């Protein structure tokens, strides 16, 4: 029944993965990669959810409120930590703190592309506000899951090496 989430050994105390957990479709993939590298994972959500019984995995339930989970993550993330989120403003805040951010479809957010992502988000919000109908995100598919796994593994390897290029 799948891979175990626990891996013997001590987690790397300098690297942490945070998940913007509400509606995140790739939590099991994060658990697998984190177990392989013995990394701590913190899921941040607005409501309780089931998480694996693993001493390296924690759930933080924040008060209901606009951006409460985002604010918690942004205030706790540190340089080279990894944040998994589909929220572009949260990704931007984390990049400002020196962390890495990966979208749930495997798109790494970087200093080079976050400005365009924010501008596109703002433009689409403005169009919707003006009554225009815009397409929502494409349905999540197995290729997204595969891209995400590769992007997360790349981010973990880069953080463990101390690679500052983003």
At which residue positions do the language-model features occur?
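Nuclease catalytic cores that cleave nucleic-acid phosphodiester bonds
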Residues: 2-166
């Amino acid at each position: 029944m799948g891979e175990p989430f626990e891996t013997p050994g001590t987690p790397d105390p300098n690297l942490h993965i945070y998940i913007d957990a509400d509606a995140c479709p790739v939590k099991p993939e994060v658990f697998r990669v984190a177990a392989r590298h013995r990394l701590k994972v913190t899921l941040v959500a607005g409501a309780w959810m089931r998480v694996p019984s693993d001493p390296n995995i924690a759930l933080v339930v924040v008060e209901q409120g606009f951006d409460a989970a985002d604010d918690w993550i942004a205030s706790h993330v540190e340089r080279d930590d990894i944040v998994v989120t589909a929220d572009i403003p949260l990704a931007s805040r984390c990049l400002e703190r020196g962390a890495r951010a990966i979208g749930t479809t495997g798109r790494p957010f970087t200093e080079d592309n976050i400005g365009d992502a924010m501008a596109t988000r703002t433009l689409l919000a403005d169009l919707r506000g003006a009554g225009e109908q815009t397409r929502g995100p494409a349905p999540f598919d197995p290729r997204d899951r595969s891209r995400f796994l590769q992007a997360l593994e790349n981010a973990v390897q880069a953080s463990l090496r101390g690679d500052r290029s983003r």
